[in-house]
């Protein structure tokens, strides 16, 4: 089981999750997907449902769904949701336990970055801790990624969460990124964290699946 988080929203968590799911399935692994919280519809959940060709109910794969494309805590307020934090945690936990029993491996994908509030002061990182999962951080190769990646890893570690590694999602072609190798070296050295994957496209990627599955 693994929790896929990222340095920001729109960083490619769903894209990377879909590549992981697709290839783990090709390896013969019975893999499932959980998106505990999704705002702005169910596009991410539907993407993985189609890739995995699963009959899992959408309400199971995505127990907390909010209509507006906002931070979950703001969407809860604006939509006047009656759900309490305890009820939210219970719904997510029940979905997680159900899927965990059904599958050999479960990909759990967050929403936004690690510090986005879900409800009140309960952050996405608190959800990772609540579920007792290790994390993989999806990052980008562009200028600024050193700061964003190291801050994300440090925050997770300060919460007592084990970070298995970083996957670089090339939202910008590497040929357009100056000295990206040195950027990656800096992340690994300063953050004492391994880059376990580089995704250039759905067909062109290098991922250490052993680190994902361990």
Swiss-Prot record:
Keywords: ATP-binding, Biotin biosynthesis, Cytoplasm, Ligase, Magnesium, Metal-binding, Nucleotide-binding. ATP binds at residues 10-15, 44, 109-112, 169-170. It is found in: Cytoplasm. Its EC number is 6.3.3.3. The active site is at 35. Pfam families: AAA_26. It comes from the Archaea. Mg(2+) binds at residues 14, 44, 109. GO terms for molecular function: ATP binding; dethiobiotin synthase activity; magnesium ion binding. Transmembrane segments: none annotated. Homodimer. Catalyzes a mechanistically unusual reaction, the ATP-dependent insertion of CO2 between the N7 and N8 nitrogen atoms of 7,8-diaminopelargonic acid (DAPA, also called 7,8-diammoniononanoate) to form a ureido ring. This is ATP-dependent dethiobiotin synthetase BioD. It comes from Methanocaldococcus jannaschii (strain ATCC 43067 / DSM 2661 / JAL-1 / JCM 10045 / NBRC 100440) (Methanococcus jannaschii). The gene is bioD.
């Amino acid at each position: 089981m693994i929790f896929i988080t990222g340095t920001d929203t729109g960083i490619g968590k769903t894209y990377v999750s879909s590549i992981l799911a697709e290839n783990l399935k090709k390896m013969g692994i019975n893999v499932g997907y959980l998106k505990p919280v999704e705002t702005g519809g169910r596009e991410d959940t539907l993407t993985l449902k189609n890739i995995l060709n699963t009959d899992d109910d959408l309400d199971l794969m995505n127990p907390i769904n909010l209509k507006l494309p906002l931070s979950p805590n703001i969407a809860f307020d604006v939509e006047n949701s009656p759900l309490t934090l305890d009820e939210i945690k219970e719904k997510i936990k029940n979905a997680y336990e159900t899927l965990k029993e059904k599958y050999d491996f479960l990909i759990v994908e967050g929403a936004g970055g690690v510090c986005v509030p879900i409800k009140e002061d309960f952050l996405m990182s608190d959800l990772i801790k609540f579920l007792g999962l290790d994390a993989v951080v999806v990052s980008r190769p562009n200028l600024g990624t050193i700061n964003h990646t190291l801050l994300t890893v440090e925050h997770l570690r300060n919460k007592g969460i084990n970070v298995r590694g970083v996957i670089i999602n090339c939202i910008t072609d590497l040929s357009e990124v100056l000295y990206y190798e040195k950027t990656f070296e800096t992340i690994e050295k300063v953050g004492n964290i391994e880059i376990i994957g580089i995704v250039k496209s759905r067909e062109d990627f290098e991922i250490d699946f052993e680190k994902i599955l361990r």
